[in-house]
Structure formats: C-alpha cells, structure tokens
From Swiss-Prot:
Pfam families attached to this UniProt entry: DUF386 (PF04074)
Function: Opens both the alpha- and beta-forms of N-acetylneuraminate (sialic acid; Neu5Ac) to provide aceneuramate, the preferred substrate for NanA. Has preferential activity on the beta-anomer rather than the alpha-anomer. Accelerates a reaction that is spontaneous at slightly alkaline pH, facilitates the reaction at acidic pH.
Record family assignment: Belongs to the NanQ anomerase family.
Localisation per UniProt entry: Cytoplasm
Any one Gene Ontology cellular component term annotated for this protein: cytosol
Keywords from the named record: Cytoplasm, Zinc
PANTHER family recorded: EVOLVED BETA-GALACTOSIDASE SUBUNIT BETA (PTHR34986), N-ACETYLNEURAMINATE ANOMERASE NANQ (PTHR34986:SF5)
Gene from which this protein is expressed: nanQ
Identification of the protein by name: N-acetylneuraminate anomerase NanQ
Cofactor: Zn(2+)
Length: 154
C-alpha cells in the first residue's frame, strides 16, 4: 500500500505506470463525471467513478484483486480505508475471476488510513483493503478508483 496527495504527485515515488494512470484519470476530470466506468486506455487502465455513503467497517467486507492495481482517489468527503499486507485476508469467499475480485470477512493485523479530498491510496494485487468506511459519522463521498493492469508494471 502506498498513499499520497495529487498536489505532490511528481514526488510521490510512484512507478511511472501508476503515475501515468493517475495523470490520465485526473485529465478526464472525474469530479465532473456521473458515477460509472470510464475507459482511459481500454482494459489496461480505466476508472470507476462512484458516490455513496460511508458505512461502519463491520458492515463491509475487504476486497482483493489479482490482475489489477487499485488507485483509490477521494474527490469529496472523508473516507477511512482499512487494509493489510498481502496474505493477511481471512474467511474469503470464492474469487470472481471475470470481475477480478474476492471478498473477505477479516484482515489480520488490520491497519487504517483516512483519506481527505485530493489524497489517494494504491493497493497492489493481493493486498486486502476495505474502502468506504466511516470517519466519525456516516457521510456521502465521491471517489474514483483507477484500475491499472498489473502487468503494466513489468
């Protein structure tokens, strides 16, 4: 897991493929987009714009991916994301290969970050993460998740 702020993107230390993907997403002006999927570079890089209310972590499950890296960028509101190191997800459901995700009930040695608008978090394949968790009181957030095919890092 890595995190940073859009305003200091050039010094964030991201792999060039991730920096390019985030730059493409920002150029597409996600804050002005309706919720939905937007292709940036075919299936290699796309973004999902979403608006929803944050929830208690006990109401949510962690997610894992195999083929894609997640760059979670908060546009409005405040969001807590719980996460763990690769291999720490427990009580996992069947993997959905077509949509590249698996849901898990728990994360061993769970950690947390709080995102504010303009902040992003990067989750590599295999790193469990539970986005959309409440900070204080539930509230509406708008975010974009940039999906980057992991083999672009090769």
């Amino acid at each position: 897991m890595m995190m940073g702020e859009v305003q200091s993107l050039p010094s964030a230390g991201l792999h060039p493929a991730l920096q390019d993907a985030l730059t493409l997403a920002l150029a597409a002006r996600p804050q002005e987009k309706a919720p939905g999927r937007y292709e940036l570079q075919g299936d290699n890089i796309f973004m999902n714009v979403m608006t929803f209310n944050t929830q208690s972590p006990v109401e949510k499950k962690a997610e894992l991916h195999e083929q894609y890296i997640d760059i979670q960028l908060l546009l409005n509101g405040e969001e807590r994301i719980l996460f763990g190191m690769a291999g720490t997800a427990r009580q996992c459901e069947e993997f959905h290969h077509e949509d590249d995700y698996q849901l898990c009930s728990t994360i061993d040695n769970e950690q947390a970050i709080i995102l504010k608008p303009g902040m992003f978090a990067v989750f590599m394949p295999g790193e469990p993460h539970k986005p959309g968790c409440v900070v204080g009181e539930p509230g509406e957030i708008k975010k974009v998740v940039v999906k980057v095919k992991a083999d672009l890092m090769a």
